Amino acid sequence: MGSVFLPHLHSGWHVDQAIVTEEERLVVIRFGSDSDRSCMLMDEILYSIAEKVVNFAAIYVCDTTEVPDFNEMYELQDPMTVMFFYKNKHMRCDFGTGNNNKMNFVVDNKQEMIDIIETVFRGARRNKGLVVSPYDYNYKRIQ
């Protein structure tokens, strides 16, 4: 139900504009199918923390079946992917999973997700291209 309340990006142009026009906040985009279970779970977490992170993060969702433009560029083969951008730059985060480009697993704790977003934002403000997650998700590695 959370995805209903989160802003949807309905075209490649909308995704680009969300990434390019946000000057001060971190842009968090959940890519995936709105009907996928893992997307629904992540959307609930993102919706529940949206008000708490509004000062430093803008959260969006993008249905990859509706907007396939970025599937190849961002390697969006997973059912659910969360990516971070700051001032038109892709932010990478080391979660201990081996894939630093994106989060392709569900974080089921609200405070953990807030901490991750805050860590990525702080690293982005310091011009770090890669930040280390405050939590190790090695056990959530997707083969």
From Swiss-Prot:
InterPro entries: Dim1, Thioredoxin-like_sf. It comes from the Eukaryota. It holds the Pfam family DIM1. It is found in: Nucleus. Gene3D superfamilies: Glutaredoxin. The keyword Cell membrane does not apply. The keyword Electron transport does not apply. GO terms for cellular component: spliceosomal complex; U4/U6 x U5 tri-snRNP complex; U5 snRNP. GO terms for biological process: cell division; mRNA splicing, via spliceosome. Keywords: Cell cycle, Cell division, Mitosis, mRNA processing, mRNA splicing, Nucleus. Belongs to the DIM1 family. Component of the 25S [U4/U6.U5] tri-snRNP. Essential role in pre-mRNA splicing. Also essential for entry into mitosis (G2/M progression) as well as for chromosome segregation during mitosis. This is Spliceosomal protein DIB1.
